[in-house]
Curated annotation (Swiss-Prot):
Belongs to the peptidase M24B family. Archaeal-type prolidase subfamily. Co(2+) 2 binds at D212, D223, E330. It is found in: Cytoplasm. Binds 2 cobalt ions per subunit. InterPro entries: Creatin/AminoP/Spt16_N, Creatinase/aminopeptidase-like, Creatinase_N, Pept_M24, Pept_M24_MAP, Peptidase_M24B, Peptidase_M24B_aminopep-P_CS, Prolidase_arc. This is Xaa-Pro dipeptidase. Gene3D superfamilies: Creatinase/methionine aminopeptidase superfamily, Creatinase/prolidase N-terminal domain. Coiled coil: none annotated. Keywords: Cobalt, Cytoplasm, Dipeptidase, Hydrolase, Metal-binding, Metalloprotease, Protease. Homodimer. Its cofactor is Co(2+).
Length: 351
């Protein structure tokens, strides 16, 4: 039985334990994870007690047949798809399924009961296979090259958006399907914006510049952040940079199987707080990375998830002082048998 069918088998076992007649998978990353297909116009996997089938609109049929590891059926109208659900009383669904679609399933397919299946899919996706890790490593390699290119491109007078355009082009030239998210090039006062997507602001001498980017490669993501100074850093910039670097390094060193996401977040957060900047670290320490750039676990002060070998997460502490500037240092890391391994490897010292 191949790996895709092993995933279906685990879902069927979950169905048996929870008295679910069938499971409907509609979220694009989950459709790809289970079937190996990624229909642009969307698709639905219907898993019953004996089989799994991918249903796609007619225009996606030929491509889906080439990609899918499970049988594929096509439909012209949604009513044709609803017929495949006839006789099903209890249906497992993802929490992301739109309310309107659920109402249609009640009306058109006469579904009486809906049960959430997010946990079983999340528990499978949260541990990466060797194949997945190799793909993510390549995505990280592309991101590393892009960060170095950004550092070279950043000069006084250049627009943030110009730098972003260059590095996004480079990522595609190096094999990325596209950026994992809108590239952040945030300079000067904008570096204090954690999600300061590249703008028309011109970079100035003395600016802190936060570079946050990622590459999507063969459906998997990477994520990296580095912060530089244009010209020579002042004492305040050096101070907050060294604090963030200390917190980031300590968290990476502490990441290992058995520690909780909450404990890991606290390690970095406490270091920043001890230096008096706790109020300026206003987001979680990190997040899982895989088919989605933000997925489980949430490496936050509220997440009790126990880290396990094979998880891929980010470690990204920051200090953001409004109207002055900010610093963030982020790596994508792999939880290994005895610790962790940085998958993004660009130098972390202040440039």
């Amino acid at each position: 039985m191949d790996i895709m069918n092993e995933k279906v088998k685990k879902i069927i076992e979950f169905m048996d334990k929870n008295s679910i007649d069938a499971v409907l998978i509609a979220k694009n990353p989950n459709v790809y994870y289970i079937s190996g297909a990624s229909p642009l116009a969307g698709g639905y996997i219907l898993i019953t007690g004996e089989s799994a089938t991918l249903y796609v609109p007619e225009l996606e049929y030929e491509m889906a047949k080439e990609e899918s590891n499970i049988p594929v059926e096509k439909f012209k109208k949604m009513d044709e798809f609803y017929k495949a659900l006839e006789g099903i009383k209890s249906l497992g669904i993802e929490s992301s399924l739109p309310y309107g679609f659920i109402e249609e399933l009640k009306k058109k397919a006469n579904i009486k009961e809906f049960k959430k299946v997010d946990d079983v899919i999340r528990d499978m996706r949260i541990i990466k296979s060797e194949k997945e890790i190799k793909i993510i490593e390549k995505a990280c390699e592309i991101a590393d090259k892009a960060v170095m290119a950004a550092i070279e491109e950043i000069t006084e007078g250049k627009k943030e958006r110009e730098v972003a355009a260059k590095v996004e082009y480079l990522m595609k030239m190096n094999g990325a399907e596209k950026p994992a998210f809108d590239t952040i090039i945030a300079s000067g006062y904008r570096s204090a914006l954690p999600h300061g997507v590249a703008s028309d602001k011109r970079i100035e001498r003395g600016d802190l510049v936060v570079i946050d980017l990622g590459a999507l490669y063969q459906h998997y993501n990477s994520d990296i952040t580095r912060t530089i100074v244009v010209g020579s850093p002042n004492e305040k910039q050096k101070e907050i940079y060294e604090i963030v670097l200390e917190a980031q390094k300590k968290a990476v060193e502490s990441a290992k199987p058995g520690i909780t996401a909450k404990e890991l977040d606290s390690i970095a957060r406490n270091i920043i707080a001890e230096y008096g900047y706790g109020e300026y670290f206003n987001h979680s320490l990190g997040h899982g990375v895989g088919l989605e750039v933000h997925e489980w676990p949430r490496v936050s002060q509220y997440d009790e998830t126990v880290l396990r070998e094979g998880m891929v997460i980010t470690i990204e502490p920051g200090i953001y002082i409004p109207k002055i500037g900010g610093v963030r240092i982020e790596d994508t890391i792999l939880i290994t048998k005895n610790g962790s391994k940085r998958l993004t490897k660009t130098e972390r010292e202040l440039i």
